[in-house]
């Protein structure tokens, strides 16, 4: 499809949704969120291997990302803090008993419909909830004890390959800058160069189709 046949209507004055990055002279640099990325974001990386880098001629955004994380892989020497910034000394350990491991495996293999009305506290006891494994997991994925056990199970299945990198964040990958500057801007420029029409500060209140 020709780019000039594509129209993107955006209620905000900037592209990217929650990936936005805004410099406000009064508030400083404001960014509503960031994504913890990893190797198996296949759809994202398949998209960005076609988007040219804004900084490196002849390279794609994916090339840029790959080179950065190969040269400077993510790693944390202090995984958690206590008492206003003191090292919690989790020391790379999970502190899971055999019983705790079995509770996690049981959840992993439980049918979805058996978890519809259950919380994490319903399926884990203190063997898991007092472990450093749970500290790692809940701080990486923003889980609370009262959250859905089904959601927990689905996260386990999606991110099982991250288990080994939980104690030091080595499973995570990051862009060079915030994700607005590293992902949204290159994509926006690529689309604009192809003739795509962006209309900001535009809210759609109704759509009328004329079938002929």
What are the language-model segments listed below?
Residues 1-23:
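Glycine-rich FAD pyrophosphate-binding loop
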Residues 10, 33, 59-60, 187, ...:
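Glycine-rich, histidine-containing beta strand-loop boundary motifs that form or position
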Residues 2-4, 58-59, 199:
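Short helix-terminating capping/connector loops at secondary-structure junctions
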Residues 26-108:
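Dinucleotide-binding Rossmann-like beta1-alpha1 core, especially the glycine-rich loop
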Residues 11-14, 42, 203-205, 209:
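An acidic- and aromatic-residue-enriched active-site/binding cleft used to recognize and process polar
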Residues 16-18, 74-76, 144, 207-209:
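Short catalytic/ligand-binding loop motif for oxyanion handling, primarily in non-cytosolic enzymes
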Residues 102-212:
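Active-site/ligand-binding neighborhood in enzyme catalytic cores
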């Amino acid at each position: 499809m020709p780019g000039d046949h594509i129209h993107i209507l955006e209620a905000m004055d900037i592209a990217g949704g929650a990936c936005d990055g805004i410099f406000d002279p009064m508030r400083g640099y404001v960014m509503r969120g960031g994504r913890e990325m990893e190797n198996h974001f296949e759809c994202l990386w398949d998209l960005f291997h076609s988007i040219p880098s804004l900084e490196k001629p002849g390279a794609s955004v994916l090339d840029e990302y790959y080179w950065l994380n190969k040269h400077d892989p993510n790693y944390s020497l202090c995984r958690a803090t206590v008492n206003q910034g003191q090292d919690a000394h989790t020391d790379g350990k999970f502190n899971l008993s055999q019983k705790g491991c079995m509770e996690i495996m049981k959840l992993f293999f439980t049918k979805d419909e058996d978890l519809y009305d259950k919380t994490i506290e319903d399926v884990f006891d203190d063997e898991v909830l007092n472990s450093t494994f749970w500290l790692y997991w809940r701080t990486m994925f923003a889980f609370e004890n009262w959250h859905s056990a089904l959601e927990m199970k689905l996260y386990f299945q999606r991110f099982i390959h991250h288990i080994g990198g939980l104690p030091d964040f080595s499973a995570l990958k990051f862009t060079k800058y915030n994700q607005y500057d590293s992902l949204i801007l290159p994509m926006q420029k690529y689309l604009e160069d192809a003739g795509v029409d962006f209309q900001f500060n535009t809210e759609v209140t109704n759509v009328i189709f004329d079938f002929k």
